[in-house]
Amino acid sequence: MTQMIYPTTNLKATEQLVIERGEGVYVYDNRGQQYLEGMSGLWCTSLGYGNEEVVEAAAQQMRTLSYSHLFGGKTHPAAMKLADTLADMVPVNNARVFLGNSGSDANDTLVKLLRYHFNAVGRPEKFKIIARERAYHGVTVAAASLTGLVPNHT
C-alpha cells in the first residue's frame, strides 16, 4: 500500500487493486488479470484506453500548449474551439459553455450559478436544490451534499 488516501474507499473492507494498463475497453492489474472497464475510468475514457487518435491529439496539444487556465478572461485556441463545438451541439440560441475539470466541478459551478441567478433577480430566498437519492453527483463539498449516497458525505 502507498501513502495515498483513496476517495470513498474503506480499505479494511476492500482489497487494494492496482491497475497497471488499459487497452480498448479492458484494464489489467499488476497480476495480469483482465477486467472489462464498464465505467469508462469514471467517465473519462469513453473512447477507450490507448485510442491512438486520442493519444496523438493529446500529444500534439501537449507540444503546443500543455496547460493554460481560463481565469481572468484568458483563453486559448483549443478551449475556444471546444466551447464553440459544444455550443453548436445544443438547441439553445446564444449558448454559453463552462469548461471545468470534472463533473463535481460542474455541479459545484451550477450551484453557484443558481445562487447568483436568484440573487440577481431579487429572489435570494430561493436556495434549495432538489437532487435524487442514491444518485452520484460528485465528491467535492457541494456535489457530495447533493449526492444521495451517505458514504460520500464524510
Model-derived features with residue positions:
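PLP-dependent aspartate aminotransferase-fold enzymes
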Residues: 84-154
